[in-house]
């Protein structure tokens, strides 16, 4: 009877550990999908007006679609 109780306890611990590990993996996978689905291409950012095309005045590289700012957005 003692062996059966110990076996059941060990089984319960192993199953709960597996469940915790599985939920952690699923959370990481969902986070990766969410991160990559938010990224837009340069063309999408330009089309939606989120960045400036070249020869437009800028104050930081993040404003330019090319990511290159020197008073005006540069093509490259």
Curated annotation (Swiss-Prot):
Expressed by the venom duct. Residues 20-45 form a propeptide. One of its GO terms (molecular function) is toxin activity. GO terms for cellular component: extracellular region. It is found in: Secreted. It holds the Pfam family Conotoxin. The keyword Signal applies. Disulfide bonds join 51-65, 58-69, 64-73. Its main location: secreted. Keywords: Disulfide bond, Knottin, Neurotoxin, Secreted, Signal, Toxin. Residues 1-19 form the signal peptide. The presence of a 'disulfide through disulfide knot' structurally defines this protein as a knottin. Probable neurotoxin. Belongs to the conotoxin O2 superfamily. This is Conotoxin Im6.9.
């Amino acid at each position: 009877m003692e062996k059966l109780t110990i076996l059941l306890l060990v089984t319960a611990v192993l199953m709960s550990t597996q469940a915790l590990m599985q939920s952690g993996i699923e959370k990481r996978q969902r986070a990766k999908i969410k991160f990559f689905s938010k990224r837009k291409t340069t063309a999408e950012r330009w089309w939606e007006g989120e960045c400036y095309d070249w020869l437009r005045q800028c104050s930081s590289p993040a404003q330019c679609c090319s990511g290159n700012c020197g008073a005006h957005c540069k093509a490259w």
